[in-house]
Amino acid sequence: MSLNLSKISPLILLFTAVMLLSGSVFSSAADIPFVRGDANTDGVVNLSDGIWLLQYLFLSTPEGECAAARDFNSDGQVDLADALGVISFRLLDGAPPAHPYPYCGDSSIGECASYPICPPVPDVQVNRDELGVWFIEGGSIFDLYEAFGYEVAVDRLWQAEYFRRLCRGRLAEIYGVDQAQTDISIRLLGYSDEEYLAGFENISERAKELVLGYIAGFNRRIEELGADPTDLPFEFTDFGFFPEPWTVVDVMALQVTLLRNFDSEALSTHQLDNAVLLAELEDEHPQDALAMFDDLRWLDDPDAPTMIPPTTPFQGLQSAQGLPTPVAGQYQVENLRLLRDRAHEVFEGTRDRLQGIGTPLRMGSYAWVVGGDLTDSGNPIIYAGPQMGFTAPAIIVEGSLRGAGIDVSGMAVPGLPGMIIGRTPRHAWSGQVAHAHTVDLYLDAVEDISLHRIETIPLGKDQFFNLPVYRSVHGPVISPIVISTENLEGPVVTWKYSHWGNELRTVDVNLDMVMARNLQEFSSAMDEFSVSLHVCYADRRQNIAYWMAGLDPVRVPGADPRLPQLGDGSMEWTQPVTYKPRKTVTNPSRGWIGGWNNKAGSGEAGGANPNHAYGKFHRAHAMQDRLTSAVAEGPLDFEFVRDLALEVSATDCCDLGKNGGNKWFFVSESFTEAVEADLTPERLEALQLLESWDGYFVEGGEEAWVSSTVNSDAWELQDRWIRRVLELVFEDELETETLTWRRQGENLLFNILLRGLPGSDLTLQNSINWFENRSSVAKPSDPFELIVWALDDTLASLGPRPWDMDRATIDYQADSLGVVWSAPWLDRSTYAQVVEVGPEGPTRIESMIPLGQSGAIYVNGQDPEFDPQYFGFTEIFDGFLHRDFPVFHESPQD
């Protein structure tokens, strides 16, 4: 090969010159296996390998005997891309070599006759800090994750067992027939064992290794307990069984079922609920039914706060006229309510049953990331606060993995082999439940379904139930539960999920997120992430970014997304299936990104789900307003970004998934004007109380926010007053057969109220006058008179001050033991991390988890005995005192 200097870039010439000055480097040959990317075969992948490849390509140096080692990108060829890949990897946060890396291993691509040296794999070392958090280092990827699985099993074997049984549909076997419907629901929506195993075969070789290692770690702990059951968790003794070995199917099922619980559409009956609502509105208000429905289930409110900063303000007013017109067949269905009720048993009923045994899974989360231009250090700072409910033990553990090319710390869920939210030496990320339209419920004909398999569900006491699982081309039949199609009258409801099949690769996607070396690689992982989540991001290149993950298929024109889809072929997803462009932003000019489960960006969002209610009022304002004000005053420090979480958590009470923010500030002018027009001493006193209110549901500042036992009188007044107004406004229109005003969502109705108040200049307008009295009971139709009426009712119900209403508590309930810990209620996250990312990686990390790292309860005679670390974090977490976590050049002892 001759060298043509005119065709070589200055960068290549530079490295070639360095190579010529340093001399050629060769090593003696040895047998394979090999390390990919180690072109000069010295046992490591570094800059000298890129230089060696340039010399080989352009100076005709000998090629050696291991082409696979030189083939950095594993495409079967050794070319300039491999040289540039090595250089980018070492200097520019480029992608690492393909497998096998960083240790020797075989490869199915490339040739390797001999290889000089295999670097020794370091032994796995596990250390724990004073709170029991584990730090695992060294080993191959199998070894690293074997230790990961083992340490999780030591801390959370019973909790992982519960998750396994939930996700495999085996709760009734130990909890009894009350959970049989839960098991039926899981089996209907899940994959067969064969499908889970096929999904495992389709993940990457590296992902397979870590899954198998994680399982081996769990099983090592189970074997230890089999030999010496002294530390067998109390619950196994209480329920009377010993844990079975873990399998691939267990992990695959767990990643699917648990993550669906954090997809706002995956496990819901919203489209069927909406169909019932529209049908009942037609029964009660035939002239106004569609207008009412459009007001109640809007698709786009341009005034709603968004994750992505708006660029161009919306001009003019917007009404519901642009909404799709429902096709009669989408809601005028025989036995519609029965179909809805049975589907409810599959979805919401499962949540209710899990709540009954103290293991609710909740959806929420706040997060924000501030760019370096706005911080006093010049570094981006990210806060991640996923809200997943409060159980005993908590749903998550914390730890650190460092080895086999993986370097990450953060939050993990027992039974899932990955860090769901965390940080690496290059980046940090968050996760919040989002609103990608991932599910359609189809009304299919009986002749279009077929038996897929029979699932055998153990009910305990040697009793079993054989469940037929039927599917159509759209997916599993969820309503009714079909035992036989003989004499079955349609339609049936089937569940079509955009993440079906893709979600089986979640372990690979999480690995890609962890191992991403730059923003582009992390973005590629977001393209494959099969959960509808808002994800904020910061990296050492000073980037901040946001994505809404989740696959939102393009639907055919005319199909109303708020309602069930017809299974007659007229409302199919486009073929081949295409997806709407992902909502994302990088380094916005505003300098920060953040929200609290709010709308991603402009355009339609969340119309099928009444819990979304993306309107002018959304709890995200509590965080966004404070950030906007703080930025205007000057650079933000680490403490402000961290402590903002406590502020927003104290704005409202007491529903983790729905409350938050300050409704009063959105109606204070209208409500005050109404009352001042007809003042009495009692009404004036109420206004004066609210005029001096600081906007938090507990008085007294930060210390009181975490410790006070009574609610603020002002908060109590405005909360009850607004609720009473909503009742008076909507009770007559929404007094339908099954869907009363109380089932519409308080935030949804509040936004409709805002649009209807006198003088409203909001972009989205109501189609009807909701203040009109449609009932037989006399009450005002004038908005101001009704507001005053509601105030009088509220004051009468409260009685004389001070009210000093008891503050709600967060109650941690453990299996069989009931409530084991309580703390004052805050609308807070289950996990918290705040990370400042400098040019060399994180410079400061703080975090906290509820209760403690361990969830182990042991048998001590007849009584349960809690592990010393079961309550290790309570002082930190209850006090909202984020604690220091080691950055990546520190050890847990530093």
Model-derived segments and spans:
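Cellulosome-associated attachment modules in secreted, modular CAZymes
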Residues: 14-121
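Glycine- and hydrophobic-rich flexible loops that cap the catalytic core of alpha/beta enzyme folds
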Residues: 403-414, 422-427, 431-568
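Second-shell loop/turn segments in exported
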Residues: 40, 72-74, 147, 193-209, ...
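Charged, long alpha-helical assembly modules
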Residues: 706-796
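Terminal end segments
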Residues: 609-679, 771-894
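Hydrophobic alpha-helical segments
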Residues: 439, 531-630, 726
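Substrate-recognition/specificity elements adjacent to catalytic centers across diverse enzyme folds
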Residues: 120-381, 386, 728
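Bacterial N-terminal signal peptides that target proteins for export
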Residues: 2-13
